[in-house]
């Protein structure tokens, strides 16, 4: 390949990260002066939050997903644009509404979710609606498991990850377990594990590691998944205890510092 062709290939990589998955509206509580619970509208969804983080770091990000043609879908699009995230891959539909999630903050700092998603627009993304040119033009492709709870989004997510793998992309995967969204936990485990075959990088919680492997030991659980699926890097979040990281046989554990849950 000549020098001009090499320059063309580099120039075609328009994005650092393209993220696919759910984009929803979280309603988070706070107390007003009368001590009544008030819910504040906040666009969210783990894959979209990741894209926002990438953009805040000064890198180029794009998002692939589906929202409703409603006021919440409009907020989602506006939020992406304000964050500097490419919205070319976002599909809008009038067949169903944007998914909503009401959040309860627990004394431990953890969160509990109540979802209004029956169905939600994010569940209805079909593979033929996925803009593959975005995947062609990225260095890293990221996806999670919430978009795989139901069809057609399950197939769309799996096929997009498979396509990214075939194109030699670095693939990041977040097996994010939300039990109430799955038909049953057996299906959740099977689907979440099936997607591991595409991952180079996995971010997982210690509860999710135990759910998928039956192991509570971080060394054993991470080694099992990484060897079985060829994963190159794994980060395990440990809530208040920090995080654990593994690359090959090299491991590290870092403590957490106090933060206010928001």
Describe each model-derived feature in a short phrase.
Residues 2-86, 260-262:
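Glycine-rich phosphate/adenosyl-contacting loop at the front of the ribokinase-like
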Residues 2-3, 7-16, 162-163, 218-262:
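Conserved phosphate-binding/catalytic region of the ribokinase-like
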Residues 26, 99, 145-149:
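Glycine-rich phosphate/pyrophosphate-binding beta-alpha loops
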Residues 60-143:
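Conserved N-terminal subdomain of the carbohydrate kinase-like
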Residues 73-85, 189-197, 221-222, 226, ...:
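Short, electropositive alpha-helical surface patch
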Residues 146-224, 231-232, 241-243:
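Conserved beta-alpha-beta core of the PfkB/ribokinase-like small-molecule kinase fold
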């Amino acid at each position: 390949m000549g020098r001009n062709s090499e320059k063309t290939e580099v120039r075609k990589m328009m994005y650092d990260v393209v993220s696919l998955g759910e984009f929803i509206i979280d309603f988070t509580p706070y107390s007003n002066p009368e001590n009544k619970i008030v819910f504040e509208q906040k666009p969210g969804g783990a894959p979209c939050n990741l894209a926002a983080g990438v953009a805040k770091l000064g890198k180029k990000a794009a998002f692939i997903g589906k929202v409703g043609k409603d006021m919440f879908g409009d907020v989602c699009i506006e939020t992406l644009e304000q964050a500097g995230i490419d919205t070319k891959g976002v599909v809008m539909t009038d067949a169903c509404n944007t998914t909503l999630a009401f959040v309860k903050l627990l004394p431990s700092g953890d969160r509990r979710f109540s979802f209004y998603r029956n169905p939600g627009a994010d569940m209805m993304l079909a593979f033929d609606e996925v803009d593959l040119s975005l995947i062609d033009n990225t260095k890293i492709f990221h996806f999670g498991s919430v978009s795989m709870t139901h069809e057609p989004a399950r197939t769309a997510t799996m096929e997009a990850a498979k396509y990214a793998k075939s194109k030699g992309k670095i693939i990041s995967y977040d097996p994010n377990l939300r039990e109430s969204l799955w038909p049953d936990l057996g299906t959740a485990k099977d689907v979440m594990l099936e997607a591991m075959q595409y991952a180079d990088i996995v971010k997982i919680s210690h509860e999710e590691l135990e759910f998928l492997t039956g192991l509570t030991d971080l060394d054993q659980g991470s080694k099992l998944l990484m060897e079985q699926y060829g994963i190159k890097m794994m980060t395990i979040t440990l809530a208040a205890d920090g995080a654990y990281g593994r690359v090959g046989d090299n491991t590290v554990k870092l403590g957490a510092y106090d933060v206010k849950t928001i």
